[in-house]
Each structure stands twice: as C-alpha cells, then as structure tokens.
Amino acid sequence: MNLEVVAQLTVLALIVVSGPLVIGLLALRKGNL
C-alpha cells in the first residue's frame, strides 16, 4: 500500500472515531444525555 493511501485511511478513521467522541463530550458538558 502507498503511504498516501495509508494516510488517507488514517485521516478517515480519525474523523469517524473523533466525531461521536466530540458529540459525546459536548453532550456531557451541556448535561443533556
């Protein structure tokens, strides 16, 4: 695999994982679960 492909997959994985985490943190801060 090319480094470019690995980098793109890594970025996509980080976005997919960080999305729900950010929403969860915002929900916890607001106290709305």
Swiss-Prot record:
It comes from Zygnema circumcarinatum (Green alga). It is a single-pass membrane protein. The keyword Disulfide bond does not apply. One of its GO terms (cellular component) is photosystem II. It holds the Pfam family PSII_Ycf12. Keywords: Chloroplast, Membrane, Photosynthesis, Photosystem II, Plastid, Thylakoid, Transmembrane, Transmembrane helix. InterPro entries: PSII_Ycf12_core-subunit. This is Photosystem II reaction center protein Psb30. It is found in: Plastid, Chloroplast thylakoid membrane. PSII is composed of 1 copy each of membrane proteins PsbA, PsbB, PsbC, PsbD, PsbE, PsbF, PsbH, PsbI, PsbJ, PsbK, PsbL, PsbM, PsbT, PsbX, PsbY, PsbZ, Psb30/Ycf12, peripheral proteins of the oxygen-evolving complex and a large number of cofactors. It forms dimeric complexes. The chain crosses the membrane at residues 5-25. HAMAP family: PSII_Psb30_Ycf12 (MF_01329). A core subunit of photosystem II (PSII), probably helps stabilize the reaction center. GO terms for biological process: photosynthesis. Belongs to the Psb30/Ycf12 family.
